[in-house]
Swiss-Prot record:
Organism in which the protein naturally occurs: Rattus norvegicus (Rat)
Major location category of this protein: other
Localization: Microsome; Endoplasmic reticulum
Taxonomic lineage of the native organism: Eukaryota, Metazoa, Chordata, Craniata, Vertebrata
Its job: Acts on retinol bound on cellular retinol-binding protein (CRBP).
Similarity comment: Belongs to the short-chain dehydrogenases/reductases (SDR) family.
GO molecular function ontology, one term from the record: all-trans-retinol dehydrogenase (NAD+) activity
This protein's pathway: Cofactor metabolism; retinol metabolism
Designated name of the protein: Retinol dehydrogenase 7
CDD domains in the record: type2_17beta_HSD-like_SDR_c (cd09805)
Chain sites annotated for binding substrate: S164
Catalytic activity: all-trans-retinol--[retinol-binding protein] + NAD(+) = all-trans-retinal--[retinol-binding protein] + NADH + H(+)
Positions of NADP(+) binding: 33-57
Length: 317
C-alpha cells in the first residue's frame, strides 16, 4: 500500500513539475509594475525581468534608487517615484502606468515595497509604531492593488504579493508580522474574487534574506529607540540584560539570513511567467524546513519551542 502511495505522490509531483514549466507566450509584450525597486527583491526582479525581455515599470521611493536601476538595465525599463503611504502618489503612478500599457492592460502587479521597523517587544511600543509599518506593508499593498486592478483585469494578468514566513508564524512584536498576516488574508480573498476574471494571485513567503528589512544597524537603532521610549515600569520588568540578549538573538537571526536573493526573485518570476503559477511560494531553506513546518504544529507545541529558545525578561515567572 505504501509503495502505491509513494508512486502516486511521485507521479503527482512529476505532473505538477511538467505543468508548471509551461511558459506564457509573448512575454516581450507584457508589462509588469513592481513596487520597492530601490534595492532588495524588487531591484533584482526588475533587472531579471528586463533581461528576459519583459516591459518593466519599476517604482522606486527615491530618484537616486531609480537612477541606479536605470543605469543597470535596458531602455525598455522605465521608472516612477512612488510612496505607497500617499494616496496622491499612488493615483499619479496608476495614471503613469495606464498611459504606458494602453489597451493591453497590466500583465503583472508585484507588491514588494516593505519595511520591518519598528520591531521588538510589543510592550515597548506605541500605536504609531504599529501604524507606520502597517501603512507601508499592508495598507500600501491594498491601495496600490485597488488602483491597479482595472488594468490587471484588462490583461487577465497576475497579482504577486510579497508576504513572509512571519505571516504564518509570529515570532516578533510590532507591526511587521501583523502586516504580513494581513497580506496573506488580503491575497486569499483577492484570489477567490478575481478567479472569475481570469486573474491569478500568488503569495511569496520568503524566509530570512539579507535585505534592508534585515539590516542589523537599522534593527539595532530601532531597538534602542524603543527601549528609550518605554516606561520605567516596563524597563524594570524586562531589564537591561533582556534588552542586550534580545539584540544578540536578533543579530544571530540576521547572520543566518541568506544572501542569495534569487531564491525569492525566481519564485516571483515564475508566478509572473508560468501558465500555471502556484498559489504560494516558500523561498529559502529556513522557510521550507523550519518556519512552515512550525506553523503547522499544534499551537501549544510551537509555543513551547519558542518559549524554550527565547530570551526571558528579568521578572519572568
Amino acid at each position: 500500500m505504501w509503495l502505491y502511495l509513494l508512486a502516486l505522490v511521485g507521479l503527482w509531483n512529476l505532473l505538477r513539475l511538467f505543468r508548471e514549466r509551461k511558459v506564457v507566450s509573448h512575454l516581450q509584450d507584457k508589462y509588469v509594475f513592481i513596487t520597492g525597486c530601490d534595492s532588495g527583491f524588487g531591484n533584482l526582479l526588475a533587472r531579471q525581468l528586463d533581461r528576459r525581455g519583459m516591459r518593466v515599470l519599476a517604482a522606486c521611493l527615491t530618484e537616486k534608487g531609480a537612477e541606479q536601476l536605470r543605469s543597470k538595465t535596458s531602455d525598455r525599463l522605465e521608472t516612477v517615484i512612488l510612496d505607497v503611504t500617499k494616496t496622491e502618489s499612488i493615483v499619479a503612478a496608476t495614471q503613469w502606468v495606464k498611459e504606458r500599457v494602453g489597451n493591453r492592460g497590466l500583465w503583472g502587479l508585484v507588491n514588494n515595497a516593505g519595511i520591518s521597523v519598528p520591531m521588538g517587544p510589543n510592550e515597548w511600543m506605541r500605536k504609531k509604531d504599529f501604524a507606520s509599518v502597517l501603512d507601508v506593508n499592508l495598507l500600501g499593498v491594498i491601495e496600490v492593488t485597488l488602483n491597479m486592478l482595472p488594468l490587471v483585469r484588462k490583461a487577465r494578468g497576475r497579482v504577486v504579493n510579497i508576504a513572509s514566513t512571519m505571516g504564518r508564524m509570529s515570532l516578533l512584536g510590532g507591526g511587521y508580522c501583523i502586516s504580513k498576516y494581513g497580506v496573506e488574508a488580503f491575497s486569499d480573498s483577492l484570489r477567490r474574487e478575481l478567479t472569475y476574471f481570469g486573474v491569478k494571485v500568488a503569495i511569496i513567503e520568503p524566509g530570512g534574506f539579507k535585505t534592508n528589512v534585515t539590516n542589523m544597524e537599522r534593527l539595532s537603532d530601532n531597538l534602542k529607540k524603543l527601549w528609550d521610549q518605554a516606561t520605567e515600569e516596563v524597563k524594570e520588568i524586562y531589564g537591561e540584560k533582556f534588552r542586550d540578549s534580545y539584540m544578540k538573538a536578533m543579530e544571530s537571526l540576521v547572520n543566518m539570513c541568506s544572501g542569495d536573493l534569487s531564491l525569492v526573485t525566481d519564485c516571483m518570476e515564475h508566478a509572473l511567467t508560468s501558465c500555471h503559477p502556484r498559489t504560494r511560494y516558500s523561498a529559502g531553506w529556513d522557510a521550507k524546513f523550519f518556519y512552515l513546518p512550525m506553523s503547522y504544529l499544534p499551537t501549544f507545541l510551537s509555543d513551547a519551542v519558542i518559549y524554550w529558545g527565547s530570551v526571558k525578561p528579568a521578572r519572568a515567572l
